[in-house]
Design a protein with these regions (language model features):
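N-terminal loops that bind phosphate or other acidic moieties
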Residues: 2-135, 139-377
Length: 377
């Protein structure tokens, strides 16, 4: 009887999305001596790749809209319609993602979430009753001001002028007026799939540098976030200062909670619940997952850690295929995985490794299949 393997990979950031990673592993296993029965269950945590994972595993339709990128340029962004068009799935990175900018353009003072707000509006035009927003992979630290502006919120400075885009808007924000927000939001449920648990205050220090913020700018944005949370508390009667997950995507999660009454959820758990992961796991003998770079963050609730925990609860073995392992690797730190295999064939540069991720995954899965096919004497 064929071994039943559940393939639940995470994306290799900047190299290979989770859907293609799953297909590469399947190819390798099926060409091996093992000849297993494979079920593909790619995972995401709310960040880059969430949309493709949802579309690949549900009855869905991909829709496009012309919106603004983080710097206000026109970009064609995709979103999905699932559940017979009743629910829209928006990946924030499609409109406001770091991947849309070259390194020299990363400047949180100017980058805005306005385009994501336009995607929300486009989804409302489709008549949906629920919108799921995956908020990872953003280029922004604007506290979600751009989204609120795109949806009709009036955010002004001390002179009554609209605040500028980006974190520059946070620096002069004085008044919040929600009276002109799109009225359709009142009957639409908003769910935010978060990839981190960080709070609003403290988020700039953690995520600002990767989005182009200098240490001085990080400290400045932290002060603005604190003042912003005080404004929200006085205007909207909601405390977002230390709201769990509120710091996701530079404060977008906190804004959607405060202005749109959104529910903030663990992105991985939400996606797996929607795509039937538990049922697939119940029918499997073994789980294979992946991670680009294995490190301590892998164990902080990220997708691979979550699926590994679920598998171990059922007493099923877990194999992890990784792009790299840390120099200070210790098996004691990764006890949820029965075996960890680096996929690199030889010492190579990061750019070369990223170029051949699919090939490396397929080859490693092929050898893994041959290993699993060896019969005990």
């Amino acid at each position: 009887m064929s071994l039943k393997i559940l393939i639940a990979p995470n994306a290799f950031k900047g190299s290979l999305d989770a859907v293609k990673a799953a297909q590469a592993i399947q190819q390798g296993l099926e060409h091996s001596a093992l000849h297993p029965h494979c079920t593909l269950q790619p995972i995401a945590d709310g960040g880059d790749g969430m949309l493709e994972v949802m579309l690949a595993q549900t009855e869905s339709k991909k829709v496009y809209a012309e919106v603004e990128d983080p710097l206000g340029r026109s970009v064609k962004a995709a979103y999905g319609l699932i559940q017979n068009g009743k629910t829209a799935v928006i990946e924030m990175a499609e409109a406001s993602g770091l991947r849309l900018l070259i390194p020299e353009e990363r400047d949180p003072r100017k980058t805005s979430t306005f385009g994501t707000g336009q995607l929300v509006k486009a989804a409302l035009d489709q008549g949906v009753s629920e919108i799921v927003v995956g908020v990872g992979g953003s280029a922004t630290v604007d506290g979600g001001l751009g989204i609120i502006q795109a949806l009709g919120g009036i955010l002004t400075d001390e002179q009554g002028n609209p605040v500028p885009r980006g974190a520059n808007g946070l620096s002069v924000l004085h008044s919040l007026d929600t009276s002109q927000l799109d009225s359709r939001l009142q009957t639409c449920r908003i769910t935010v799939a978060c990839d981190v648990t960080n709070t609003l205050v403290g988020a700039a220090e953690v995520f600002g540098p990767q989005k182009g913020a200098s240490p001085e700018l990080v400290a400045e944005i932290e002060r603005h976030f604190l003042r912003y949370s005080q404004l929200v508390k006085s205007h909207l009667r909601k405390d977002i200062t230390y709201l769990p997950r509120g710091g996701a995507a530079g404060g977008v999660a906190a804004a959607l909670y405060a202005f749109l009454n959104a529910d903030l959820v663990n992105g991985t758990e939400y996606l797996l619940a929607k795509t039937g992961f538990q049922a697939a796991l119940n029918q499997s003998d073994l789980l294979i997952t992946t991670e680009g770079a294995l490190d301590v963050q892998t164990q902080s609730g990220k997708g691979p850690f979550y699926v590994a925990q679920q598998s171990k609860k059922q007493g099923k073995p877990v194999i992890m295929l990784v792009g790299s392992v840390p120099k200070d690797y210790s098996p004691a730190d990764y006890q949820d995985y029965d075996a960890i295999f680096p996929i690199g064939p030889r010492p190579q540069s990061l750019s070369e490794a990223m170029q051949y991720t699919a090939e490396n995954l397929e080859r490693t899965a092929y050898q893994l299949g041959n290993l699993l096919a060896i019969k005990k004497p």
